[in-house]
Amino acid sequence: MRKAGNFQGEYLQDYWAIAECGFKTNGYFVEFGAANGKEISNTYILENQYSWNGILSEPARSFKDELLKNRKCSIDHRAVWDVSGKELKFMENKDAFLSSLYSKENTNTLGEKESYLVETITLTDLLKTHSAPKIIDFCSIDVEGFEYKILKKFFSDGIYSINHIAVEHNWRADGNLLIDLFLENGYTQKYMHLSQRDYWFSRISIST
């Protein structure tokens, strides 16, 4: 697999996604955190070159104006978490691409710039709110350490299916938990030699 065209994904995530989907047009994506929606975005090309629609979630205030300018799909400024309707502390880093909900584990490594409260929403509720189809073609997840609890809740809800998922692990200690969670829910891991700090998974039922 090689990079081509104007793909933005830092580690070929967008190219992998569109290739797995047979370079289809009019697919559906969800991406959180979406940052400014363009720079190293895993869904920008899907929307702008392949006419996909979808949802972006990004609570960082510094990205709000850019995100609205860069993208035409649905945008939600709540933080995806495992519970909806909570207000949690959000840490906006000097490098805004590293901003995240607060946790004891990331407060030292992220380097807090400022903090403020953000409302949370589960992935299932995010999809419901924006009238997403029951089968999502591609999901990109980068939430600096909260991936496992978000996905565990999503899989337990059992309402929506996602065919392909790119989830950043950044070599965190809970990586094996994430892998096991995907395997238990009918996914197979793809291109481990290419995915770098991401895990890429496809649903077995659509990859065989």
Language-model-derived ranges and their functions:
Residues 1-208:
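Phosphate/nucleotide-binding beta-alpha loop and adjacent structural elements of enzyme active sites
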